[in-house]
Amino acid sequence: MENFNQIFTVLAASEGIGLNLDILETGLLNILALVAILVYTGKDFLGSILQERKSTIVKSVQDAEDRLNEANRRLSEAQKQLSQAHVVISEIRNETKTAKTNLLKSDATTAKKELTTRFNRAISSFRSKERVIFLDVKQQIISLVLKRSAIQAKETFGSKKRARALINETIQKLEGDLL
């Protein structure tokens, strides 16, 4: 409380509060020098951090573009295989219609057996093609996932320091869960 009294006493004696425009007395030069030193010494630090962040972002974007291109390529391959399957289906339908008209002209019992045999062959052919296409697409997807996982594992556990830190962090979390 005594400090406040002293402040008001000094203000009353000096005729109020005023603005000091003397640059040397106010310490403005010191502040400007300090800011200049901070900018000069900090630009390398901030520049390296920003450059590292930029390269990480560029790498992530490039990886995403690569995955998009790969997915588009696989999609176009799957669409081609689907169109081939549709062609096979239309051929089977045409053959079935032709066989049906031919069989209707012949004996009913023989026609029924022949039609059943052809139909079963067509179904098995279609299922076989469908299975081959499915297995091919499945194998391509598995291969792509394994490649991506291996690349990501190398990036994540590339340095021993990062791997140790991750292992220690996991152990600490597990210890916390057990307690």
Swiss-Prot record:
Where's it found, cell-wise? Plastid, Chloroplast thylakoid membrane
Is Thylakoid among this UniProt entry's keywords? yes
What UniProt keywords are attached to this protein's entry? ATP synthesis, CF(0), Chloroplast, Hydrogen ion transport, Ion transport, Membrane, Plastid, Thylakoid, Transmembrane, Transmembrane helix, Transport
* Gene Ontology CC terms: chloroplast thylakoid membrane; proton-transporting ATP synthase complex
Coarsely, its chief localization is plastid
Membrane topology reported for the UniProt record: Single-pass membrane protein
Q: Which residues cross the membrane?
A: 28-46
Report a single Gene Ontology molecular function: proton-transporting ATP synthase activity, rotational mechanism
**Keyword set includes Transmembrane helix:** yes
Q: What does this protein do?
A: F(1)F(0) ATP synthase produces ATP from ADP in the presence of a proton or sodium gradient. F-type ATPases consist of two structural domains, F(1) containing the extramembraneous catalytic core and F(0) containing the membrane proton channel, linked together by a central stalk and a peripheral stalk. During catalysis, ATP synthesis in the catalytic domain of F(1) is coupled via a rotary mechanism of the central stalk subunits to proton translocation. Component of the F(0) channel, it forms part of the peripheral stalk, linking F(1) to F(0).
Record's miscellaneous remark: In plastids the F-type ATPase is also known as CF(1)CF(0).
- Assembly and partners? F-type ATPases have 2 components, F(1) - the catalytic core - and F(0) - the membrane proton channel. F(1) has five subunits: alpha(3), beta(3), gamma(1), delta(1), epsilon(1). F(0) has four main subunits: a(1), b(1), b'(1) and c(10-14). The alpha and beta chains form an alternating ring which encloses part of the gamma chain. F(1) is attached to F(0) by a central stalk formed by the gamma and epsilon chains, while a peripheral stalk is formed by the delta, b and b' chains.
Q: What is the protein's given name? A: ATP synthase subunit b, chloroplastic
